Amino acid sequence: MIKKIIFYPPILASIAAAGCISLLALMSDATSTFILWMIPTFGASVVLITALPNSPLARPKNIIFGHLISAASGVLLATIVIPSFYSLGIAVGLAIFFMMITDCLHPPAGGNPILVILSGSILEFNLLPLAVGVLFISIYAVILNKIILKRDYPWF
């Protein structure tokens, strides 16, 4: 009976998501850069890896490259135009375009160009925490889904 309750999908997804975000927060706290490492789009990525692990949008490849491609589109637009209503839209549109043509669509990453542009300066939006965070989330997803839960989950 207890095993059935623990492995009830909403409970399992909630516990797994809480664990992933808590570990990211612990890593952030340990490096004394709490805010830098806690990127809001990570929350939505964790929803996909824990609640919808069979979705193609939750593949490690999509998580990693989707976030990096989207952030890069934000950096590109922040570099060549003054932040405005249209630069936000164009950056998100570019992110979607490049994620789709590379088969790396990851909807949570669509928020990254907005974060980059609204940060006020591309220097203020550090790509390192994003890269480390998405690698951590992807490794967590593989360990959770493929190794612990024995799901048919891609390595990459």
Task: Give residue ranges: language-model regions.
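Non-transmembrane, interaction-prone segments in cytosolic or luminal domains
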Residues: 46, 109-112
